Amino acid sequence: QSATNNGYVTYTSTVSGTAVTLLVSENVHTQSGVNPLSARSFSVAETSSDDVIVAKAGNDTITTGQGHDTLIYNVLDASDAKAGHGIDHWTDFGFGSTATDSNAETIQFSSEFFNDLLSDSDLTSSHLSQVEKFIKVDYDAATESATVKVDRDGEANGSNYQDLLVLEHQTSNVTLAELLNNHQITIG
């Protein structure tokens, strides 16, 4: 572990030698009483294996490299619209069928993440009409990114989608139906 003056802390894994860089900013109290929001971010260094990453509070940047990687979203704060998560960025999300593409990634939500949404690890586009009440994907061709948005209670209190995850470097349109057919979104 080492710390530098610019707020970066680097931890080196004893297992694989890959580095994980953390950027931590704390709340600052000033004489005028201003209390800026704290920010906690981390970058996961890429590996060549099938990694499982558990998302935490804060705005995380994830780069996983080769392999079929899974990002898991658990409930950190049941009263929060995004279950306690910030807006994460996955820099190298592999879009494709998990059955045929060894680099296709998976976004997994815990069964408690959504209220009244079926828990099924084998979701497909046949579930689209139910899933799209809780999950929305907006593709932006200008930035080549797809934003995964969530509404944890579906239509219960009206539609109120919140940005959860930005899939960067997506050169073609990414849709919820395709993510479901590719088995890249799972629940449970």
Regions found by a protein language model. Name each.
Residues 2-45, 104, 129-188:
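Low-complexity acidic/polar repeat-biased segments
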Residues 45-127:
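Acidic, glycine-rich calcium-binding repeat modules characteristic of RTX/beta-roll
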